[in-house]
Amino acid sequence: MEMDKRMKSLAMTAFFGELNTLDIMALIMSIFKRHPNNTIFSVDKDGQFIIDFEYDNYKASQYLDLTLTPISGDECKTHASSIAEQLACVDIIKEDISEYIKTTPRLKRFIKKYRNRSDTRISRDTEKLKIALAKGIDYEYIKDAC
């Protein structure tokens, strides 16, 4: 399965800055009924631990345009508490995805927009995103415009 363009467009426009890789994993499980093939322990450019999820030919972080660096086994010790915390969240999400979505307002909003927003409107938002990025316009402005 390829990365979903509608989902990416919404994540990068109307929901920019609101979602993380755990949210993306939950949305993929809810919308597409797919579980990740692999879990990758990573850090972002600021050295913050982030758990990433690998699917057939894309990662959850790609929906958010995050550049992550996988960490080695030795580095896992440094991030042990963050790893434990995020793995616990993954277990909670997987245990009852429907309940998790119902109790997370931003994910409920995302799914509602994903299901109800027309392809034309999402395409327009994606086009605005491309134009704005080419001109160097900030994501926050794009989010407000969509």
From Swiss-Prot:
Spans through the membrane: 10-32
Highest taxon listed in the record's lineage: Viruses
Expression induction: Expressed in the late phase of the viral replicative cycle.
One Pfam assignment: Pox_H7
Segments forming a coiled coil: none
UniProt keyword annotations, A-Z: Late protein, Membrane, Transmembrane, Transmembrane helix
Membrane topology recorded in Swiss-Prot or TrEMBL: Single-pass membrane protein
InterPro entries: Poxvirus_H7 (IPR006872)
Protein name per the record: Late protein H7
Organism whose genome encodes this protein: Vaccinia virus (strain Tian Tan) (VACV)
